[in-house]
Amino acid sequence: MKQISSGEVWRWNKEVEMNSIRDCLKHCSSIAIDTEFPGCLKETPMDASEEIRYRDMKFNVDNTHLIQLGFTLFDRRGFAKTWEINLSDFDEHKCFKNDKSIAFLKSNGLNLDKIREEGIGIDEFFRDFSQILTEKDGKITWVNFQGSYDNAYLVKGLTGGKPLPETKEEFHETVQQLLGKFVFDVKKIAESCSGLSSQFGLQRIADVLQMKRVGKAHHAGSDSELTARVFTKLTFDLLNSRKQSVRRVDHQQFQLEQQQHQQFMMTRCYIPIPMPIPRPRPVMFAAHHQNPYFGGGYFRMPVQGMNYVL
């Protein structure tokens, strides 16, 4: 995939960039997303059940604000453009946060003060973005990496900041209603790829695939762009692998059919056909000779089983 361009979205250039997103979405049907947020207020144990995981995610998303949202629009031809939307609702001094997560984001170059001062309001952005999605002709494929929280923040934004549904089943139904059926997690796709593991992070998978990052890690725009390229690479390789498997199966089937055909032809044409057993002939005896097996002047000797009268 060739990187075309990228842009940061602030309050002062929002109109121009939102129009650019609208125009690009006319030609692209896939969106890779990434979110940066203030971390988890309630951390979930590794061995937690799905219900507990959803309950904790709901609590975290309902009580925190997005900081950045990254979009990369792309299609099968590889055309792509990336946007990094800076959202102003998070106030480091007033809002709930995980201190370790905030320190981590700062260490990776996020300027939280600038985002707070020059960013776009979350409600304002999602109001415009929802309108753009309704104008899209055709279905959209959404791509993320370990994207439960990405999907959750999208649902929260697209529903006007409402709390997430009470159960994970209702949440999945809401995701399908808002985003459609085509939502792919690259981390899960990696499970099916040779040499990769679902335990790998995005950067490690990119390193294995020998892909260079564009921009800084743990910035929403850069992460979404890398997610799009990794997704394109993995799905392309899986498709080729499947085609090769089909060709191998077809070749094996062809060989089997050839063997069966040869065996059939040998059975029909090349195995010597046994000569038919001739019908017994009546024995002729010489009437004028002591030894009936010599001479002429023949008469028939009845043979049993040949409908002759004894």
From Swiss-Prot:
A divalent metal cation binds at residues 34, 36, 150, 223. GO terms for molecular function: metal ion binding; poly(A)-specific ribonuclease activity; RNA binding. Its cofactor is a divalent metal cation. SUPFAM superfamilies: Ribonuclease H-like. It is found in: Nucleus; Cytoplasm. Its EC number is 3.1.13.4. Belongs to the CAF1 family. Ubiquitous transcription factor required for a diverse set of processes. It is a component of the CCR4 complex involved in the control of gene expression. This is Putative CCR4-associated factor 1 homolog 3. It comes from Arabidopsis thaliana. The gene is CAF1-3.
